[in-house]
Design a protein with these regions (language model features):
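Beta-strand segments within the central parallel beta-sheet cores of soluble alpha/beta enzyme folds
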Residues: 1-3, 65-73, 109-117, 143-151, ...
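Stable alpha-helical structural segments in soluble proteins, enriched in small hydrophobic residues
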Residues: 97-105, 131, 135, 168-172
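Active-site-proximal gating segment of KS-fold condensing enzymes and close homologs
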Residues: 10-23, 124-139
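Gly/Ser/Thr-rich active-site loops/lids in small-molecule metabolic enzymes
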Residues: 22-28, 91-96, 133-144
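Conserved beta-strand-centric core segments of catalytic alpha/beta enzyme folds
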Residues: 1-58, 158-231
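Short glycine/threonine-rich loop-to-helix capping motif typified by GTGT followed
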Residues: 80-91, 119-137, 156-163, 192-196
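Conserved beta-ketoacyl condensing-enzyme motif
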Residues: 2-13, 109-129
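Condensing-enzyme catalytic core mediating Claisen C-C bond formation in acyl metabolism
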Residues: 25-107, 113-114, 231
Length: 231
């Protein structure tokens, strides 16, 4: 799990780096715009999320409601090389992390039904989508549904992975993908994948496997793969 409280002191540093959105101060609900041509930086977020992780035997013994199974995952660092920096990921490192997670989960890339991306509403979004396509070897026609939870709740720091993983297991449980809002004007470099971006709730009866990622800050990457649990 993870928790994040809003701090003017913490976010002032990001504002000084000019990575926060300033164009929608009067309309904050429109400010977080991942994958949008008019994205202008990310929006601070806060909150908390907890996932109780235990063995299948333990969960069944105590009669727990099982939401999903963790198939596998991976973490790595791009080494601050080839475009990687304190605030941006190395695309090759991102792709290695995705592929390593798929291998660890012992699945085929074609089994990924949906992606919960890092997608922060910065200039790195098109590069991230391209990395997903390359790592999963998916064409625009076969590209999974892709969404950004940050479009609705902003970008937390220590809690981002926990919050968005909770969203993943709930989507798997109920078989839907939540919208990536404020993306009416899809970035031109992502346009060929536009059909994979839900603008409203997308019901997906076939949704079984979802991959969640956190990329970027410090050039450190993490991916986890979840599968819906069938009772």
């Amino acid at each position: 799990g993870g928790t994040e409280g809003s701090s003017h002191y913490a976010w002032a540093g990001f504002d000084s780096m000019r990575v926060l959105c300033r164009a929608h101060n009067d309309e904050p609900e429109k400010a977080s715009r991942p994958m949008s041509a008019s994205a202008g930086g990310f929006v601070p977020g806060s909150g908390a999320g907890i996932l109780h992780v235990e063995s299948l035997e333990s969960a069944q013994a105590r009669g727990a409601r099982i939401y999903a199974e963790i198939l596998g995952g991976a973490i790595n660092c791009g080494g601050h090389r080839r475009g990687g920096s304190m605030t941006a990921p190395n695309a090759e490192g991102v792709q290695r992390c995705i592929r390593a997670a798929v291998v660890d989960a012992a699945i085929d890339p074609d089994e990924v039904d949906a992606i919960s991306g890092h997608l922060t509403a910065t200039g790195a979004d098109p590069k991230e989508v391209a990395s997903w396509a390359k790592a999963l070897q998916r064409s625009p026609e076969t590209f999974p549904a892709i969404t950004s939870t940050k479009s609705m709740i902003g970008h937390a720091l220590g809690a981002a992975g926990a919050l968005e993983s909770v969203a993943c297991v709930l989507m798997l449980r109920e078989r839907f993908v939540h919208p990536s809002i404020n993306c009416e004007d899809v970035h031109p470099e992502i346009e060929k994948y536009a059909g994979s971006i839900p603008h409203v709730v997308r019901e997906m009866p076939e949704l079984n496997t979802m991959i969640k990622a956190g990329f970027g800050f410090g050039d450190v990457n993490a991916c986890a793969i979840f599968r819906r649990w069938a009772d």
